[in-house]
């Protein structure tokens, strides 16, 4: 619409002439096949003319109407739009002024359901938290018991190694009397083979 305001205004007259048969055919005469309608007086900055693009339907059997002048007393066509109608705004349904009993009951039921679901979820999380804490305590106790058992095994191994070394020292010592036999009893000698 802004580009049409920059064009030169034409008076509201009908120019006689023949319409072009095709869009590619250019008019060589000075007359144009456009019809501009509008008041003859000064305008208020709005374009009042109408240009219809396209090919005119014309046959030889149709009589050519006499060109007539448009009456100047016709006011221009003005389209007024509602200022509330703007593009890009989302239409939302209007809220009902009074809610019915069914809607109130549904809202109460929905509130109770939301509360029950929230309570159930929080209860599940609380129980799961307690179970995890109990399992963590049991795991810590099992780790402490395992560490204590491993320490006891290390101590017992060290004691057994020390005892084995002492037994080796005692068994390897030649200074001590032979404690295997009873004193005074000589072991019997096996007589040799008889002939």
Swiss-Prot record:
Residues 1-72 are annotated as: Disordered. It is found in: Cytoplasm. The modification Phosphothreonine is found at residue 59. Phosphorylated. The keyword Nucleus does not apply. Signal peptide: none annotated. InterPro entries: BLOC-1_complex_su-3 (IPR017245). GO terms for cellular component: axon cytoplasm; BLOC-1 complex; cytoplasm; cytosol; transport vesicle. GO terms for biological process: anterograde axonal transport; anterograde synaptic vesicle transport; blood coagulation; developmental pigmentation; endosome to melanosome transport; eye development; melanosome organization; melanosome transport. GO terms for molecular function: protein transmembrane transporter activity. Residues 25-51 have a biased composition (Low complexity). Its main location: cytoplasm. Pfam families: BLOC1S3. The modification Phosphoserine is found at residue 61. Component of the BLOC-1 complex, a complex that is required for normal biogenesis of lysosome-related organelles (LRO), such as platelet dense granules and melanosomes. In concert with the AP-3 complex, the BLOC-1 complex is required to target membrane protein cargos into vesicles assembled at cell bodies for delivery into neurites and nerve terminals. The BLOC-1 complex, in association with SNARE proteins, is also proposed to be involved in neurite extension. Plays a role in intracellular vesicle trafficking. It is linked to Defects in Bloc1s3 are the cause of the reduced pigmentation (rp) mutation phenotype, a mouse model for human Hermansky-Pudlak syndrome (HPS). Rp mice are characterized by abnormal melanosomes and display altered expression levels of the proteins of the BLOC-1 complex. Octamer composed of one copy each BLOC1S1, BLOC1S2, BLOC1S3, BLOC1S4, BLOC1S5, BLOC1S6, DTNBP1/BLOC1S7 and SNAPIN/BLOC1S8. Interacts directly with BLOC1S2. Component of the biogenesis of lysosome-related organelles complex 1 (BLOC-1) composed of BLOC1S1, BLOC1S2, BLOC1S3, BLOC1S4, BLOC1S5, BLOC1S6, DTNBP1/BLOC1S7 and SNAPIN/BLOC1S8. The BLOC-1 complex associates with the AP-3 protein complex and membrane protein cargos. Interacts with BLOC1S4, BLOC1S5 and BLOC1S6. This is Biogenesis of lysosome-related organelles complex 1 subunit 3. The lineage of its organism: Eukaryota, Metazoa, Chordata, Craniata, Vertebrata. The gene is Bloc1s3.
């Amino acid at each position: 619409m802004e580009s049409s305001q920059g064009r030169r205004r034409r008076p509201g007259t009908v120019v006689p002439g023949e319409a072009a048969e095709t869009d590619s055919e250019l008019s060589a005469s000075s007359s144009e096949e456009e019809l501009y309608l509008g008041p003859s007086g000064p305008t208020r900055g709005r374009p009042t003319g109408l240009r219809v693009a396209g090919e005119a339907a014309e046959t030889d059997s149709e009589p050519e109407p006499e060109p007539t002048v448009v009456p100047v007393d016709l006011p221009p066509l003005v389209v007024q739009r509602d200022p509330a109608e703007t593009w890009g705004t989302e239409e939302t349904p209007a809220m009902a002024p009074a809610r019915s009993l069914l809607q109130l009951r549904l809202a109460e039921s929905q509130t109770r359901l939301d509360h029950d679901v929230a309570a159930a979820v929080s209860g599940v999380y609380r129980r799961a938290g307690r179970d995890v804490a109990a399992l963590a305590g049991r795991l810590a106790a099992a780790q402490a018991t395992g560490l204590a058992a491993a320490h006891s095994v290390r101590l017992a191994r060290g004691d057994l190694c020390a005892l084995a070394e002492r037994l080796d020292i005692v068994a390897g010592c030649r200074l001590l009397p032979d404690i295997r036999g009873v004193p005074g009893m000589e072991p019997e000698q096996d007589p040799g083979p008889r002939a």
